[in-house]
């Protein structure tokens, strides 16, 4: 997921190492950065999910919210998103959150960028 101007060449997407699996225990989330983009990494029952760390309503960082199961709640106006799909579950907005493909190899978590 990269934005490119008409003058930029299209770059291939690749998996970027972002964290050690052991550093993000089940039921928790953390923030990683790829090319200055904040990505929220969530561990739901041992499965990792990545989404943009920004609620579309007032740009609040979702990583400062609350994770319950597969639902992350925005700390500002309590919009709720499914971390597996980025889909809005409930809240004052109608926009979903972009997600990123995740792969785990050994103890390293990779995000497709």
Give names to the regions the model predicted.
Residues 80:
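Short helix-to-coil "ATP-lid" hinge immediately C-terminal to the conserved N-box Asn in the Bergerat
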Residues 1-69, 83, 96-113:
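N-terminal pre-ligand scaffold of iron-sulfur
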Residues 69-75, 88-97:
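Short cysteine/histidine-rich metal-coordination sites, predominantly Zn2+-binding motifs
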Residues 55, 74-77:
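Short cysteine clusters
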């Amino acid at each position: 997921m990269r934005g490119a101007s008409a003058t930029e060449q299209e770059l291939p997407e690749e998996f970027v190492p972002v964290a050690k699996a052991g550093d993000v225990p089940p039921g928790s989330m953390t923030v990683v950065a790829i090319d200055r983009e904040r990505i929220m990494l969530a561990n739901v029952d041992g499965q990792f999910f990545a989404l943009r760390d920004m609620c579309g309503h007032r740009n609040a960082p979702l990583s400062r919210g609350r994770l319950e199961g597969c639902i992350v709640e925005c700390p500002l106006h309590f919009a709720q998103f499914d971390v597996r799909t980025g889909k809005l579950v409930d809240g004052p907005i109608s926009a979903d959150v972009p997600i990123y493909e995740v792969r785990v190899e050994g103890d390293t978590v990779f995000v497709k960028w």
